């Protein structure tokens, strides 16, 4: 005996969804206002009429704003924005660091023997008070030059290292990893410099 299956009993395995799209909708859903030609009158304004102008929330446009509400800017020669001759050619100072510190002395040849002796005396007397920063400000030099002229005493170096080790205990894992990578990069650079020489 043969059984035949009618097509009406067959159900599709996958569900196919069809979209009914209306292809006739306009490209711009909201129609734009026609542009107002230049020189055309928007409204008749007399002395007796009172006008209320509510501008749109957009950048001001001279073609749309009525002449009554336009701002008459003062001429350039009347504006209070005249610059001095020095500041006309220089950009504005961004921060305190960008201000020039005067003529700094970078080498030991620029220091006199009296300056070198006084730096060494002050550094050995009180290294906590006379740091490289304070001495560089006093003698108008760089901190590197101060450290070349006179090194800090061993007790001061040991104290600074102990403070730094105490700060390291508060570091997180990310900061430790960044510092380790920086140290390895610096070591690699010094090896490269030695290899080039």
From Swiss-Prot:
- Note the Pfam families from the entry: MRP-L20
Q: In its keyword annotation, does this UniProt entry include Mitochondrion?
A: yes
For this UniProt record, the keywords arranged alphabetically read as follows: Mitochondrion, Ribonucleoprotein, Ribosomal protein, Transit peptide
* Major localization class: mitochondrion
Determine if Mitochondrion is one of this entry's keywords.
yes
Which one of the record's GO molecular function terms can you name?
A: structural constituent of ribosome
List the InterPro entries: Ribosomal_mL58 (IPR024388)
Q: Where in the cell?
A: Mitochondrion
- Signal peptide positions are none
Role played: Component of the mitochondrial ribosome (mitoribosome), a dedicated translation machinery responsible for the synthesis of mitochondrial genome-encoded proteins, including at least some of the essential transmembrane subunits of the mitochondrial respiratory chain. The mitoribosomes are attached to the mitochondrial inner membrane and translation products are cotranslationally integrated into the membrane.
The family classification in the record reads: Belongs to the mitochondrion-specific ribosomal protein mL58 family.
Assembly, per entry = Component of the mitochondrial large ribosomal subunit (mt-LSU). Mature yeast 74S mitochondrial ribosomes consist of a small (37S) and a large (54S) subunit. The 37S small subunit contains a 15S ribosomal RNA (15S mt-rRNA) and at least 32 different proteins. The 54S large subunit contains a 21S rRNA (21S mt-rRNA) and at least 45 different proteins.
Q: What is this protein called?
A: Large ribosomal subunit protein mL58
Gene transcribed to yield this protein: mrpl20
């Amino acid at each position: 005996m043969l059984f035949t299956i009618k097509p009406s009993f067959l159900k599709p395995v996958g569900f196919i969804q069809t979209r009914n799209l209306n292809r006739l909708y306009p490209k711009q859903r909201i129609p734009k206002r026609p542009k107002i030609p230049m020189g055309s009158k928007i409204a008749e304004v007399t002395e007796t009429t009172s006008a209320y102008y509510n501008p749109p929330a957009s950048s001001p446009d001279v073609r749309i704003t009525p002449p009554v509400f336009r701002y008459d800017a003062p001429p350039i020669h009347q504006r209070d924005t005249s610059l001095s001759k020095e500041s006309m050619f220089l950009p504005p100072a961004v921060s305190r660091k960008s201000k020039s510190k005067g003529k700094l002395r970078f080498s030991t040849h620029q220091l006199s023997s009296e300056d070198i002796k006084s730096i060494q005396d002050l550094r050995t007397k009180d290294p906590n008070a006379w740091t490289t920063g304070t001495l560089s400000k006093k003698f108008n030099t760089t901190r590197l030059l101060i450290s070349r002229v006179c090194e800090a005493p061993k007790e001061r170096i040991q104290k600074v290292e102990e403070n730094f080790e105490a700060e390291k205990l508060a570091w997180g894992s990310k900061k430790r990893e960044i510092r380790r990578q920086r140290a390895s990069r610096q070591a690699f650079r010094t090896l490269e410099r030695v290899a080039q020489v």
